[in-house]
Amino acid sequence: MSIILGIDPGSRITGYGVIRQNGRHLYYLGSGCIRTSEKELPGRLKQIYAGVSEIITQFQPDVFAIEQVFMSKNADSALKLGQARGSAIVAAVNADLPVHEYAARLIKQAVTGNGGADKSMVQNMVMSMLKLPAKPQADAADALGVAITHANTNKTLVALAGKATGARKGRYR
């Protein structure tokens, strides 16, 4: 059993989602958004760090998963997003959590079966997969998607590791 904290980073709104993985089953523990109020970026980064640190203290996750930065046409936006990610990652590292990163396309593929899915599709699938009574906020749904992706990726890697022997069989050696 492990608790996974997923993060959808943003310099204004950072989504978070926490799930518990018990074997093949996933259970919803909590989600929401860290909304920054500061006008200047350094103040927003401080709020992201403090918010993620508080979530880590509250839920005591075993692992931290975060969405990777995608290249944007707007370099300034991409840089701010990278700094927001950095603030969240530092909070995880300070709590001695292992950090895993996933591309947005992989997350959408893992959750909806379509790497080009829109936010509404992700929200609907997250709601269905975690048996939520209502559609989560878009940023929180994305963060839950990050956590689900890690749970499913980790499950696959563990299964493969159990079957791998390192020896090849057959006529080609």
UniProtKB/Swiss-Prot annotation:
Q: Which reaction does it catalyse?
A: Endonucleolytic cleavage at a junction such as a reciprocal single-stranded crossover between two homologous DNA duplexes (Holliday junction)
Q: Which cofactor does it need?
A: Mg(2+)
What positions does the entry give for Mg(2+) 1 binding? D8, D139
What the entry lists under SUPFAM superfamilies is as follows: Ribonuclease H-like
Q: Which UniProt keywords apply?
A: Cytoplasm, DNA damage, DNA recombination, DNA repair, DNA-binding, Endonuclease, Hydrolase, Magnesium, Metal-binding, Nuclease
Tell me which residues this entry annotates as catalytic. Answer: D8, E67, D139
Name under which the protein is recorded: Crossover junction endodeoxyribonuclease RuvC
Question: What gene codes for this chain?
Answer: ruvC
